[in-house]
Amino acid sequence: MERFQGHINPCFFDRKPDVRSLEVQGFAEAQSFAFKEKEEESLQDTVPFLQMLQSEDPSSFFSIKEPNFLTLLSLQTLKEPWELERYLSLEDSQFHSPVQSETNRFMEGANQAVSSQEIPFSQANMTLPSSTSSPLSAHSRRKRKINHLLPQEMTREKRKRRKTKPSKNNEEIENQRINHIAVERNRRRQMNEHINSLRALLPPSYIQRGDQASIVGGAINYVKVLEQIIQSLESQKRTQQQSNSEVVENALNHLSGISSNDLWTTLEDQTCIPKIEATVIQNHVSLKVQCEKKQGQLLKGIISLEKLKLTVLHLNITTSSHSSVSYSFNLKMEDECDLESADEITAAVHRIFDIPTI
């Protein structure tokens, strides 16, 4: 078997070999070679076979000028390895020349040399880097193949492991439960306190039952009633203010016709009305006297009270106008005092200050 050695062109690693173009090229060269044989039939009779081979250019019937490894691999991937022979068999019988048989023997030897290699084309193609494929797509393809090769149980376990969260300690769970219970108890206690205070504010008629819902509903109804009462009171206040303003206007109109001197005399007359008030608490007497101012009236009154066994402890004098005076006595009843009630003391004071009884 002959060994073929030659330079491997690196450009074949960057592209997939085009098998169809090789087939078409071989077919075209075979037809051109057949055409030349028809034109030179006369040479077969005159020139010996060896001279004819020496005179011909080997490039005219060898389609592969520099055989390399990738070209041989592309020839191996054909469904029927020697489709070129099938195309040539359909032509004229002139293709079965010694030159064609030599090319066939050359191709068969190349096929045997390639088939002796243990690397299949699919694996070689897989290992070759592609210019169009990106590193991300290669990584995804490799991941898909690995996932496809793994059994389904292992993939499910991986998914379950991803979904599982880190389990908490029993102490943390117990602490969370205790905190939740404490917060809930505090909330219920505050709610019960608010409900009880609200129930105390409501009238009994608004509480039908003792549950929380009835208490809250009664409070809502009671607030609505209070709003209505406030609205009615505000309306009454407005009407009262209007009526008071009318009364004041009438009084001002009436006073506008009265002179200032007459108004002063009427005020003095109202203040000069005599008044006597007596209050008895055990043996103490509180006496208030309002009367017309007279000369020596106070001294005469104190002497008269001493005769009635009423001792003056404190005295306060106020003058409200030019003609009236007000006395406030704080008296003590002696044991020999014959007066016992407030009415008796009032009658005696009327006689002392010459105030007529009403």
Swiss-Prot record:
**Compositional bias (Basic residues):** 157-166
Q: For this UniProt entry, what's an example GO CC term?
A: nucleus
Q: What is its main location?
A: nucleus
The answer to whether the entry has keyword Iron is no
Q: Which Pfam families match?
A: bHLH-TF_ACT-like_plant, HLH
MF terms (GO), sorted A to Z: DNA binding; DNA-binding transcription factor activity; protein homodimerization activity
GO terms (BP aspect)? cold acclimation; guard cell differentiation; regulation of DNA-templated transcription
Which stretches of sequence are listed as region Disordered?
125-176
Start-end of Low complexity biased regions: 127-137
Expression sites by tissue: Expressed constitutively in roots, leaves, stems, and flowers.
UniProt keywords (A-Z) are: DNA-binding, Nucleus, Transcription, Transcription regulation
**Sorted alphabetically, which SMART domains does this protein's record hold?**
HLH
According to the entry, every stretch annotated as the bHLH domain falls at 175-226
| PROSITE patterns, per the entry | BHLH
Q: Where in the cell is it found?
A: Nucleus
- PANTHER family recorded for this chain? TRANSCRIPTION FACTOR BHLH67-LIKE ISOFORM X2, TRANSCRIPTION FACTOR FAMA
UniProt subunit comment: Homodimer.
Q: What is this protein called?
A: Transcription factor bHLH67
Task: Give the originating organism.
Answer: Arabidopsis thaliana
- Protein encoded by which gene: BHLH67
